[in-house]
Amino acid sequence: VCPSSESQHYLTTNHRPKAEVFRGPGQAITMIESSSPGFGATAIPMARFGAEYGYDLAELSNDIESVQRGGRWAVMIPFFGDPVFARFASWESAPRESTIGFWLGVDSSTWTTSMDRETYERAVETTRSAISKGDVYQVNICRIRSNGCAPDSDIMALDALLAEGNSAPYAGALRIPEIGIHIACASPELYLSREGSRLVSKPIKGTAPRAVDLLEKDRAENIMIVDLVRNDLSRCCDVGSVKAVDLLEVQQHPGLVHLVSTVQGEISQHVGWSNIIEATFPPGSIAGAPKIAALDIIDSLEPENRGPYCGAFGWIDVDNHTAQLAVAIRTFWVDGGLLKFGTGAGITWGSDPGAEWEETQLKARHLSSIAERSWNHS
């Protein structure tokens, strides 16, 4: 199976080559440089996906081939940066005592953004100009919001806050202090799931406060990305098996609605996870179409790299032929002592710059307010 040339180009240019990081019994770990020194440094490694909590970190790698060794792995493949694959030996139905700390809410008045309204609207116009020239059909343009956070706050406590205030179907969290990984995800979007040989993706395109506010532009945008996802899955699935089984489903989420479509296929024989990721990453809904042209525009317009935001986040269990990877949207992470959160919008020729800015505000408003609250397990 040949990976998509677009995905291969992206993985080569945005994921820096590095020797495998491996941690196993009796072996030292080669550290990935921590971007958040001191943050949560006394906490033990831990993961949560759904109602299961991962403990007892057994292996740590940045090579996707590691998951073929078996076990259940937490997976973080950032939009920009080094991937992390972490195998936890124990998965339990409740958090262990004293393994979740506290979250001291961030100051609501000190959020900063990588693009203010004027800059963002100018980026929308630049993208529309590229569309008018036929260079691209759709591009997802994002900005990163940042805020200072207490160095002894625990991302798992923020995850608990998100679970209470923003229940999401593909939520999860990962804390590995020794390599600076602190991520809490409340994603409504499925990048990939696997059950046996079946591979499923559920791209989101189209966002509004209410269903009646959805526009024809939202529907057109969704259909464009469905075609892109069908093409991606066809690179790792049996010929003729890839199909859209649900189109333009309206889903209600806290504070907004989304248009969601479902695409599925049957994985070809001898195709492993490295082939699947190479064929489909990054997710089409947060890149654009055609993907390589959209990624070039993103690189030229976004002043801050996305890091984990818009990447893949979830788990893979090769032994049971199952997996669930979210598109890492509605996701908080810690970088250099700052809490970060990305928000964006899909730009088409029919986009209004002011309305696209407001969409980024809508997506950020509810979750930002949750991060401004405090939480303590006791």
Where do the protein language model's features map onto the residues?
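Extended alpha-helical targeting/anchoring segments
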Residues: 11, 16-378
